[in-house]
Amino acid sequence: ADANEAAYAAQEAAAAIGFSIYRTEEMAELISYMRQYNESALEGEDLRFYGFDMQRISYSMRFLKESCKELEVDTTNLQKLVEGENWSSECDLSTRIETLTQVKKELESKNGSENAIHFVDILMQHSELQTLTNADGATLRDQFMAENVQWILQQEQRNGHEKIFVTGHNSHVAKWGSFDSMGKLLSKDAACLI
């Protein structure tokens, strides 16, 4: 029964990522492996799962609000920015950017706020993408994803880990194509093997 529960939990976790391309047996197996590995891993040697896309705001907003509460940063105005899993129709883009900029400024004065600041940056990335056309938005999205992967690598390097494993849609991880995909951008960095 435990193996079945673990397999089901892994499938749920894969589905929770939100993108249908990850609702696969292979992703469920990867998550299951990570869970099993972490059960016996030494402290600091556990595997972590990060997201680098900014298309969905719900997790970034949730983690930002949790971090703000821990750091004693008021979340009242952040609460007004969202309705469920989307931006509130009550707040226009300039209000959203102004609120996020103010929260970021307050977080920058707090120790231990690096992750929270990154969540603000991701929410600002999402906001900026909404103002662009499809072609411009696709290019900028991949640029943001490359920046976010670099941020993840920096976090892991701070923990003494020199390598990360990145998975994504072929059009994003590829280093070929007519536009600067995340993979193409990262392949220009000597620290990245694509």
Protein language model features and the residues they cover:
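Structured catalytic-domain cores with a bias toward divalent-metal coordination
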Residues: 1-194
